[in-house]
């Protein structure tokens, strides 16, 4: 009989744990946070881990607490994520991300004719919509284009 073994990720002393990330989105979360091989602190992540509500991803980042802008970006691709702030190996704060009603300069409009994609100095602006069936979608306030499946690929 095979013995069941659990894979454990080392606890972090100070930093952030992002839990309940939509399965398969951990690498996009790292991209949103601009974490690359040049980042010198410890970063660990698990993708497609079994959870009580199905599969999920988890990201742990030593020595970093997230800004409101970073939380808003994560909410766009993973609206059910939770953020745990860790200090001295203890969770001192636990919050769910909050999906903003409006984002500016965060996502590129996919409509090549949109004024926000021209040489004009105009930031993209989207209203944020959430439905249980379709998840998150963004509605461009300039050209009316709707983005739903491609949000992660168009983050600025």
UniProtKB/Swiss-Prot annotation:
Keyword Manganese present in the record's keywords: the answer is no
List GO BP terms, alphabetically: 'de novo' pyrimidine nucleobase biosynthetic process; pyrimidine nucleotide biosynthetic process
Specify one Pfam family: PyrI
> Gene3D superfamilies annotated for this entry?
Aspartate carbamoyltransferase regulatory subunit, C-terminal domain, Aspartate carbamoyltransferase regulatory subunit, N-terminal domain
Q: Where does Zn(2+) bind?
A: 109, 114, 140, 143
* Molecular function as annotated in GO: metal ion binding
Q: Which UniProt keywords apply?
A: Metal-binding, Pyrimidine biosynthesis, Zinc
> Function of this protein?
Involved in allosteric regulation of aspartate carbamoyltransferase.
UniProt subunit comment: Contains catalytic and regulatory chains.
| Name used for this protein in its record | Aspartate carbamoyltransferase regulatory chain
Gene symbol?
Answer: pyrI
